[in-house]
Amino acid sequence: MTHITFGTSGWRGILCEDFIFENVKVVTQAIADHLIAAGEKGGVVIGYDPRFMGDSFARESARVLAAAGVKSFLCSRDTPTPVIAFEILRRKAAGGINFTASHNPPEYNGIKFSPSWGGQALPETTKDIEKRANEMLGEICYREISLEQAARQGLLEEIDPREAYLADLEKKIDFDAIRKIGALGVNPLYGTARGYLDAPLLARGVDIRLINQHRDPYFGGFPPEPAEKYIADFISLVKNDPAIKLGIATDGDADRFGIVDGDGTYIEPNYIIALLFDYLVRVRKMSGGVARSVATSHLVDAVARHHGIELFETPVGFKYIGELISQDKIIIGGEESAGLSIKGHVPEKDGILACFLVAEMVAREGKSVGQLLEELYGRVGRYITKRENISLSPEIEEVFPARVANLPTEIAGAKVAKIIRLDGTKLVLTDGSWLLFRKSGTEPVVRLYGEAATTGRLAEVMKAGREFILKG
């Protein structure tokens, strides 16, 4: 029997194995029971990405909600995650159910639940839903009615939130400036950003080179992640077309971004977050704090110090950053895994917003991303990051908790200045370098993150991190 577990971004499973209609109905019933117990009213926005059966899962979910007396606002087509968050807030809904596995391979699907404040559900919420769902597994504890009956009872409404979201985006992005950039490469990666990432640009007469613009549940045969190793076709397009000054891409559900500079160089998300933070303060004159996850580059910290701005360090998971955005405490918050949002926008990762912000920055500054990054290094110092997955033998996996409980006072030739156990174990060294060890909860793997001022020093730090994991 499947055990329902909500991870960092919801419950995910493999289609036809554990992600089946029966389990989807159980989880939906658990969400309905949670909302009713909490006294939440206002209905639930239901969306899905382009994966197989996404629309069918969404309709079955609406049937269960209707039987529980909860109204559904069912998206008429596959819809970006940040747009679902926007619609929750716009309609003052009780929450949102999103059928997506984000950047995971095509054989996966998932349920992401968002509460009424529009961000990712916090642990106390997901634990309650998880508990309710697992108590129901193996029993027919849900009710459902037909979609026709739900509609007659006023418990089902089909919606298309695209126009309202794009109209809101018009207020937050200087699209007129983007017109001056030259040609843009645009890559929605067969995902939900089709018609979102291109339409505002075309409406302004921006010259774009659009690829991967049709729905494909296989996402072209790769995980729908706009990371360097999965977008070789897009990088080649940008590199080989001299008219293109910037390439922008999103993942399958459009909550993550990918940026390719005009010369074909892929720019890591860590650097984009820091650049946009600096841009929002220096050019847009925005005020407030900044947030990053524990695994994200300290280049963000350096920019914060440069501008005299408070920094919040959070566990991994955008839900914690989203909470700070909803509380109006920060200008921008971001994660190294290519998620960010800004003050006044949805408290959820928005890859569409991120792409347009980068395009605006490049257009208004009149410089490439690479040039802007070098200038930022000149002001605040250089930071180089790396991440590796280290596989553990059964013997090492058994002793690893004891290793991170008894840490050295010196590693990689520098003393440990600070230990942070916010999410995993992070060692900040006296020379500004740092290491983070995060054990996977589902497999015998430690995620090793490191950062230093030079590639040589980073190699030393990462080597020391690997040796600590494997040898102690």
Q: What do these predicted ranges mean?
A:
Residues 1-68, 94-95, 150-184:
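An N-terminal, well-structured beta->alpha segment
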Residues 243-246, 282, 286-472:
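Phosphate-binding and adjacent anionic-ligand microenvironments
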Residues 73-82, 266-269, 291-293, 314-315:
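Active-site nucleophile and cofactor-binding loops and adjacent substrate-binding regions
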Residues 147-150, 247, 251-263, 326-333, ...:
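Self-splicing inteins and homing endonuclease
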Residues 9, 46, 84, 97, ...:
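Buried hydrophobic positions in well-ordered alpha/beta secondary-structure cores of metabolic enzymes
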Residues 1, 109-242:
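Gly/Ser/Thr-enriched, mixed-charge loops and adjacent short helices
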Residues 33, 43-109, 200-260:
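N-terminal small/polar loop signature for handling phosphorylated ligands or for N-terminal nucleophile
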